Amino acid sequence: MKVRIKRLSENAIMPKRAHATDAGFDLYCTETSVDWAKQELLCHTGIAFEIPEGHAGLIFPRSSIANKPLLLHNSVGVIDSNYRGEVTAKFIITDAREFLQNDGGYHSGDRICQMIILPYPEIEFEEAEELSVTDRGKGGYGSTGR
């Protein structure tokens, strides 16, 4: 599948996979800004995507984020196929002191998150009076044990 990408910044880096068999490809930082009032770090990628219709781009944190005092703000970002703006990643700064001691988290050229582009099915919801019975039933949080 071909996905068109527009560079919005001179120093934008095209997404890359670390290994040919990786599901996700890394997105790179071009610049950052911090909103201290909200304890948020905004990372720009300097790129916009033309994701094919019937697909969505899912933005996930990289595993290396475990070494930083940051959390991807919305856990998983969803980039719809009709969005043409810059893809950015917003992080919550969980420890301001550690963030400052580690030189601010991310810098231009750093890999900040990963994107996976997946197809999604057409779905039609149908209202029902009853749902089929399963072993789990209405068991919610923690109902299946540890």
Go through the PLM ranges and name each one:
Residues M1-R146:
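DUTPase catalytic domain/fold
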